[in-house]
Every structure is written in C-alpha cells, then in structure tokens.
C-alpha cells in the first residue's frame, strides 16, 4: 500500500507559480475499482442517498469533496468493468440526483464544473479578465420578481424543478421583497454566517438536538422547518440575474447591489478585488479565508462579458464560461479516542476512528474512516495517537500522520478483531475487505436496501431509523418479516425522545401509511423481489436478467448452476454464489410467498401470429436502448431511472447506460449532451422522451 501523502501546502499558497495540488487517494484503492458487485451497488445507493440528503435534510451524509470523489470512483469502476450504469448520477445537473419539486425553473439551474487545478489555471490563462466570486457553502435558490415584487422562490432541486420556499425566505438578509419595477429572476446562495450559525445551533441544543454538522446542512434543516424557529437567521448572496441579459456580469451584480441585494462578489475583501489576474485573486482569497464570517470552500471564476459567455455556451450539466476552484484541504490536529467496528449490509467489516471533536474547514469532525485492516496496520495508527484530520478529494473525513513521538510508553499496536464483533463467527479474510457472512450481522443494511425505491420494493418511509427500531425490537430479522408487521406494532415503535423528554413513537397515522406501502410492495415485479433478497450478484441488472430468464421464483430456485451461468453476464463463479444463496434464502422466500408477495408468472410461449415485443429488431433480438437526461414533463416522468429501465426490458428491449456502435435507440432529454453528440456521430436514431413514450404505446418502434 502506498502511504498517505506527507507534504501538504496551506490554503492559497502558490507553489512554483501555481497552487499546490493535493491528492489523497485511498491507499490501495485509489480511483480504481470496488472489490465486488455489492460494494459497487452499495456505493451507488450511498451516492443517491447523499444526493437527496444534500438538498432536503440537515444530515451531512457527504460533503461536496466526498461526493465528487465517490462519483469519480463509481465512474472509474464502471469504465474498468464495462458496466452500463442504470442510475442517473452522471446525468443529473443538480447535486447527484437530488429530488425535484413543484416549481419549474425558467432555465435549468446547473452546477459548476470542478476540474483539476491545471484546468483552472488554463481557464484563467484563456480568460485573464475573468471575475472571481466566493464558493459559498449554502443552498442555491432562484427568486422570481414581477413588477419588482417577489412572487416565487424555489430550491434548486434536481436542476429542472425545485421546492417552493417563498414564504420561508421572506425577510432574509440581502434578499429584498421589493426591488425595482420589472420582471426578472435572481439566483444565489442561501447561507448562514458564523454568528447566525452559532444562534441556530443554540436553538437546536436547547431543544435537545445535536448541532448542525456545518453551515450548509444548517440551511437545509432550517429551511425544512416551517414553524418560524429560525426566523431571521438566513443570509442571501446573489450570483446571477436576468434583469438585463445583455449586460456584463459585473454590471448586473452592481445593479443588484444598488437595488438592495447582497451579491456574492460584494462579500469579498478589497485585497481580492484588487488582484491583477484570476489566479492572483484566488491566492488573495485563499489567504483571507479564515477571516471571512461565512464558510466557503473554494472560488468561482466567471467570464465577465455577455458576448463571450454567449460564444462559449452551455454544457448539459454546467456552463462553459465558469469553473469552480477547490482550495487544498485544511488540517487540524486531534486524538484517536477509540477504534470502532461496524458490519455493513453485505457483512463487510468497516473500521472508523472516534476522534476528539475538532472543527475542520467549517464542520465538526468526530469520526474518520480507517478503510480496512491492511491500511490501518500499515499506517500503524493506535488508540491515543495524535493525528491530522483533513478533508480532501477522497472519502472523507480522513486522518493521517500519526505522531509516534507523542505516544505514551504504554501504547500498543492496534490488533484487528479475531472474530466478528457482533456474532463471534470467523471472518472471511480472502480479500482485503474482511466479511462476516452470517445474515444477522447485516440486517439493518439489508432492510434499508430491500425497501429502497431505486433497487428494492419501494416501501417509502421504512429506511433509516424506523428500520433500525424494528430490528432492535426483534420485529424484523429479514425482508419477509416486513410483510407480517401489524399496524399497532408499527405505531408503537419508539424513535427516541421528544424535546420535553418523553418517548417519541411512530404513531398511528405514519404506521397506516407504511402499512399501505408494504401492501403495495407485494405487487412489485419479480426482478425487484430478487434484488430485495440482498444476495450477492443479484443487483438491479442481474435481478432483471434472472427474472426474464426464469419467469418465476420457483423456476429460479430450481435452476442448476449451469443454467444460472448461461444467463448473460453471470458465468460460472457468480452462478455458484447465486445458487448457494438461493438455498440459504429458501425460508425467507417461502415466507414471502406465503405473505402474498409476487413470485412471478411462468413464461408463456408466444401465440401463433402474435406480434413481436415492441422493442425488438426484425430478427427478434432486443433493441439496445439508452436513456439520458431528464424525462420529467413527459409521460415517463413518474418513473424512476430504474422504472424506465424496467419498462424498456418489459417491452422486449435491453436497457443500456452508454452509447456505442451497438446502440439502436437513444432517448434523450438533453440535446447537445455528450451522449446526444456521440449518437449523432454514429448515426443512431434519437427520440425525445415524449416520442419514445408514444412509440412504446403505439408499438411503432
């Protein structure tokens, strides 16, 4: 394993005329691949969950750097293994697929590209008059004015639609309710300054809640509250407007400032504004970071002139006239108080350090991943060690550089557990990632996965703390137990304490909703039932292929290893694992069958003269169909990405995630995207989501 990097530069310090690049690749893993299909699927699920939490909750599942790193690793794994992604993480223009809302944006609210340092330097060299703005750690909103009066405010959401938050942003500092007399839109960042972040955390702690992890999560959590608890604590900084679309950027911002808006640029110190060129401005801002009264993790460079912006144009996910620069990580010393273990959904041993809480770049770090046994032993980190905690473009938070010179004489090297800490069974140590294969050690993760919308039975409301509470009460030991729950049992499930010290329960109303979701889940297609069993190598893709090949759960259970191996993409080794796990899961499958869960229907032979499936070629083979971009607003809009994939295969086609010479049809919601351009180059037929929905309905494919 390669050691963690030893040389790190402070924020904003040029090195050899450039800025210090920082690359903390995970030792032994880097950007290469995941160890198994389960790890890859778990990573996708984690990223999708983090994307939703980013826009809608006060929980910091990942910050930007962690999310970007995980997304890059997912893409690297897919490329290395020839996987055609079924998720929309690479297509979304918001934060990784966050949910939409009830307000449609006039134009998509796009993210900014965050390229490597060399690309930022190249951008600055090409555009020496580019202007700089702080990259504020807040929440993007768009605000519509008619006749100078605020009429609508919405969160970014998925970039196309967002939640209406008009009444929750009235009176925000820097965001006037009346400004001018025209019709226009202003976009900007809703954020917490340091003083108001402290006030918000005091309110939370008085209510018996943990403080917000950082300012951005504080904004998300506070915006979700509609009772006025946090009134007057938000601030707003504008970064774009349509008030005069022919005006240069600086002129537009100055016009907004004259109307009473705070702009992002107006928050910068004069030393930054006086810098001679873009990279000098980045250096000046880096030197001033700790003196600002708000959290920022980077700088944004924007082309100033409207003419040059129009010439550069827009990409499918981000404008081409702006880039974001991420400052090198800030490090703070802390102490490893303990080394803790956890068993994940697939039985993987996860190891983390519990740290003396320390604020690193605006958020409190209390835990850090220690990756795996081999990494931890190679780094020789011990309980009681003083280490450096940092945030970088990796799975974070992380620690490195244990100070051996500060160790107590009684310090002992860390020893890994000899058996699973939960069930005392031996680990499978055949790979770098140790696993416990006993089912009881990963129930929580399996239930959450089984209930998920993206891959499982789509039981809304049953993940997270509710699932854990059911497990702790021994009401649920596997996915089949969900279908034997009673409404009264659910209503009495304890979820913690109320603000007054009482016991908070799920309640009858929420229990009734979940029971309705469980009943609905009984009719999910066979492929989702297979995937919900959380068996290795039975994720969404193979779940669909197994369901299509065997038709019923009974036929799948009766299949031989050789029959399983003949399914596209499975092969002998995976077939052996699936065959063995089907045997182990026989009691669970029996309970699901008894509960009335769909077990599929036998494949019927086509009737004489019957028409071929709608998405097949003249020779009867399935058409390779790729879907990219948003399908919102079309007849397909109610379907998740997995739902669209299932529709394609139900109609006889093969769902694919990338455009190639074998692609027969591209369903594209974003003309001009990379997949659109590649399909044009290859002469592949391209249709809109509306056209595709009509074609499938009419059978004229």
Swiss-Prot record:
Keyword annotations: DNA damage, DNA repair, DNA replication, Ligase, Magnesium, Manganese, Metal-binding, NAD, Plasmid, Zinc
Polar residues bias: start-end ranges: 1-10
Listed EC numbers: 6.5.1.2
Chain segments carrying region Disordered: 1-21, 603-623
Chain sites annotated for binding Zn(2+): 420, 423, 436, 441
Binding site for NAD(+): 64-68, 111-112, 133, 156, 189, 302, 326
Record-linked InterPro entries: BRCT_dom (IPR001357), BRCT_dom_sf (IPR036420), DisA/LigA_HHH (IPR041663), DNA_ligase (IPR001679), DNAligase_adenylation (IPR013839), DNAligase_N (IPR013840), NA-bd_OB-fold (IPR012340), NAD_DNA_ligase_OB (IPR004150)
Role summary: DNA ligase that catalyzes the formation of phosphodiester linkages between 5'-phosphoryl and 3'-hydroxyl groups in double-stranded DNA using NAD as a coenzyme and as the energy source for the reaction. It is essential for DNA replication and repair of damaged DNA.
Name of this chain's protein: DNA ligase 2
Organism: Pseudarthrobacter chlorophenolicus (strain ATCC 700700 / DSM 12829 / CIP 107037 / JCM 12360 / KCTC 9906 / NCIMB 13794 / A6) (Arthrobacter chlorophenolicus)
Organism lineage: Bacteria, Bacillati, Actinomycetota, Actinomycetes, Micrococcales
């Amino acid at each position: 394993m390669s050691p963690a990097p030893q040389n790190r530069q402070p924020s904003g310090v040029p090195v050899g005329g450039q800025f210090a690049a920082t690359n903390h690749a995970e030792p032994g893993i880097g950007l290469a691949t995941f160890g198994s299909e389960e790890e890859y699927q778990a990573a996708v699920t984690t990223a999708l969950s983090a994307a939703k939490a980013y826009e809608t909750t006060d929980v910091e599942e990942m910050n930007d750097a962690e999310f970007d790193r995980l997304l890059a690793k997912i893409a690297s794994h897919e490329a290395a293994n020839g996987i055609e992604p079924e998720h929309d993480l690479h297509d979304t223009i918001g934060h990784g697929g966050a949910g939409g809302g009830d307000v449609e944006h006039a134009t998509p609210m796009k993210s900014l590209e965050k390229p490597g340092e060399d690309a930022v330097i190249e951008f600055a060299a090409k555009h020496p008059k580019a202007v700089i703005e702080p990259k504020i750690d807040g929440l993007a909103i768009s605000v519509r004015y008619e006749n100078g009066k605020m009429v609508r405010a919405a969160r970014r959401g998925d970039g196309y639609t967002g939640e209406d938050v008009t009444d929750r942003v009235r009176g925000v500092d820097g965001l006037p309710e009346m400004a001018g007399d025209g019709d226009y839109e202003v976009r900007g960042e809703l954020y917490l300054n340091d003083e108001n972040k402290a006030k918000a955390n005091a309110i939370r702690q008085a209510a018996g809640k943990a403080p917000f992890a950082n300012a951005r999560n504080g904004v998300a959590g506070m915006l979700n509250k509609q009772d006025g608890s946090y009134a007057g604590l938000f601030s707003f900084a504008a970064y774009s407007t349509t008030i005069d679309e022919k005006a240069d950027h600086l002129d537009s911002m100055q016009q907004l400032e004259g109307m009473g808006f705070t702009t992002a640029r107006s928050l910068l110190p004069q030393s930054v504004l006086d810098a001679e060129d873009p990279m000098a401005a980045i250096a000046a801002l880096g030197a001033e970071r700790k003196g600002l009264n708000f959290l920022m993790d980077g700088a944004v460079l924007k082309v100033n002139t409207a003419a040059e912006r129009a010439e550069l144009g827009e990409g499918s996910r981000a404008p081409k006239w702006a880039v974001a620069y991420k400052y090198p990580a800030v490090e703070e010393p802390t102490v490893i108080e303990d080394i803790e273990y956890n068993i994940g959904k697939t039985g993987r041993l996860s190891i983390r350090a519990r740290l003396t809480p320390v604020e690193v770049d605006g958020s409190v770090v209390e835990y850090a991943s220690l990756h795996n046994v081999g990494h931890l032993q190679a780094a020789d980190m011990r309980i009681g060690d003083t280490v450096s905690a940092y945030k970088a473009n990796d799975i974070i938070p992380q620690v490195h550089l244990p100070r051996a010179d500060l160790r107590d004489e009684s310090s002992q090297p860390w020893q890994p557990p000899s058996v699973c800490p939960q069930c005392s069974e031996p680990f499978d140590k055949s790979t770098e990632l140790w696993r416990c294969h006993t089912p009881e050690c990963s129930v929580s993760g399996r239930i959450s996965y089984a209930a998920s919308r993206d891959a499982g039975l789509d039981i809304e409301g049953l993940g997270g703390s509710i699932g854990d509470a059911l497990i702790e009460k021994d009401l649920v030991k596997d996915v089949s137990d969900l279908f034997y729950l009673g409404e009264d049992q659910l209503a009495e499930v304890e979820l913690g304490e109320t603000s007054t010290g009482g016991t908070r329960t799920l309640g009858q109303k929420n229990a009734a909703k979940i029971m309705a979701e469980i009943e609905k889940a009984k009719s999910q297609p066979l492929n989702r039932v297979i995937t919900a069993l959380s068996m290795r190598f039975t994720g969404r893709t193979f779940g669909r292929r197994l369901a299509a090949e065997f038709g019923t759960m009974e036929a799948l259970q009766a299949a031989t290893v050789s029959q399983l191996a003949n399914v596209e993409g499975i092969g002998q080794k995976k077939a052996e694992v699936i065959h063995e796990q089907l045997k182990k899961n026989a009691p669970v499958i029996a309970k699901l069958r008894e509960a009335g869960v769909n077990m599929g229907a036998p494949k019927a032979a086509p009737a004489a003269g019957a028409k071929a499936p709608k998405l097949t070629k003249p020779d009867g083979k399935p058409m390779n169909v790729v879907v990219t971009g948003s399908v919102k607003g079309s007849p397909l809009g109610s379907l998740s990405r997995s739902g669209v994939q299932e529709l394609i295969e139900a109609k006889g086609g093969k769902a694919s995630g990338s455009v190639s010479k074998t692609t027969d049809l591209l369903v594209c919601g974003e003309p001009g995207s990379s997949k659109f351009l590649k399909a044009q180059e290859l002469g592949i037929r391209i249709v809109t989501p509306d056209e595709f929905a009509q074609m499938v309905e009419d059978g004229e494919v």
